[in-house]
Amino acid sequence: MKLQDLHKNYKKISGRTVFLRVDFNVPIIKSVVKEDFKLRQSLETINFLLSKKCKIILASHLGQPKKAGDKKYSLAPVAKHLAKLLAEDITFLDYKKYSNFKIIKKKIDQGSGLFLLDNLRFFKGEENNSKELGKHLASLAEVYVNDAFAVSHRANASVSAIRSFKLPAYKGLLLEEELKSLDKILNPKKPFVVVMGGSKISTKIPIIEKLYDKASYILLGGALVNNFYLAQGLNIGKSLVDRDGLKIIKKYLSSKKIILPIDAIVKTIIKNKKDKISIKKISEIGSNDCMLDIGPATILLFSKYIKKAKTIVWNGPLGMFEDDNFKKGTIIIAREIAALSSGKSFGVVGGGETVEALNLTGMGKYVDWISTGGGAMLAYLSG
């Protein structure tokens, strides 16, 4: 059963109790939310449902807790932060008190407004799509709304099993926008430029294969390009390589669409001495070298293609940007994409590290769409 559109069916949900699956998997340090992008992205759907007089049960996972009720993975800080963003009271259903679904349901039935369940991964069966947990979650509400794009491709009880129990099911407004934006990538205006980075070519090959015929150019950076260099018989020194991806790339070696870096920022490991950082052509890489960023000639090369684009999608950093010595390439390309978006080109950026890099430029607001789910974005685009 397909998820229905929320806007078109708002009369059917008015005044009802809604189970709203959101993605509040955000960084929390010392019980404080450190980055609230995902929370802010959820506000439109929450406010829409509140305007329709709905009682809302918010539900999300957070991290990978090893034991139920682990305070480190509690959503209590999220409840506090979200309440401020919404200027609304939120009843937080702490797992230590509310782990029994009869007690949870009684509390919800007696209350009104907004409720936030504690971490869904505290409940047995969330990650293995337990029908029993799905039934318990479905029993809390009259309507199901999925606004968690990042987990929409996963077989989780709060995404999949819950829908076995015949609740009317809708797409949240954020999920709707995610899909609309990604559909523009699947039906792009030309020239269409794909920028792919990261460490594992094996995780990116499905999307490269799916978009290959539509793409004008595919610009590759990060450690995933080392597979191509190895296949070409080039030395990659001590650079990271995804050995699982070596066989996959052979058919792309002679492609004129695939654009590889021509130089790199390199760390040379010297025994008993300080590591040396330098710019080298790919053909000059030595046995003790690690390629950790694209070089200046590559930045100019990539910029030339990006400036021609009418549609751009970017996933994955182009170097080890978390180190100041190796962030320049990723940051400059992020600026290029942001500068062209919301006007000359339609730009979509996705993936946790990619968004983090974009945020370092202070230009994220100019990008047409920043996806809340890197893995989900890749899954959707790769079909």
Question: Where in this protein do the model-derived segments appear?
Answer:
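Active-site loop-to-helix "anion-binding N-cap" substructures in soluble metabolic enzymes
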Residues: M1-G383
